[in-house]
Amino acid sequence: GTSQAFLRDAQLKTMLSVKNTGMAVTLDIGSKITNHPPEKLLIGKRLAYWALAKNYGFNTLPYSGPVYDSFDIKNNKVYVNFKFALNGVTSYGKPLSGFEIAGKDKIFYSADASIDPHYSAGRENRSILILSSKHVPNPLYIRYGWKNYIEGTLYNVEGLPASSFRSYNFD
């Protein structure tokens, strides 16, 4: 199912729109059998980063994983831009998974995902996520982690994981 993905989406929207809120993403340390991830110490550290950066003056401390911002399409490939990933994104050598892509028919297919470590588009050099699918020649919509459980594989280079995201609001 996708009910947990919708819950994570609501949490992300709340974090982005409500003052004095934060979020520690746990997609990379979750559990298939419970909503309560077993890695409590790591969750506490991630929440501490947020508090230190936002409330205690440690303004240069990374405190959030990549948050979907926008995408550009070039040659039927989707180049995904993120907030909180100024230096780029990484999978730390793990295969990227959980990405999907759709065209105007709004039918999602598993996407081939890669990271270009030297991408530059008028910005400083940084790594960027690239999505494509042979089933979707004209991509319009993307999403990541749109299932109840996924093993997160996308991080910013500072080591914080990305939450589920989607580029649309039609369902």
Ranges and model annotations:
Residues 42, 53-95:
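Surface beta-strand/loop "capping" patches
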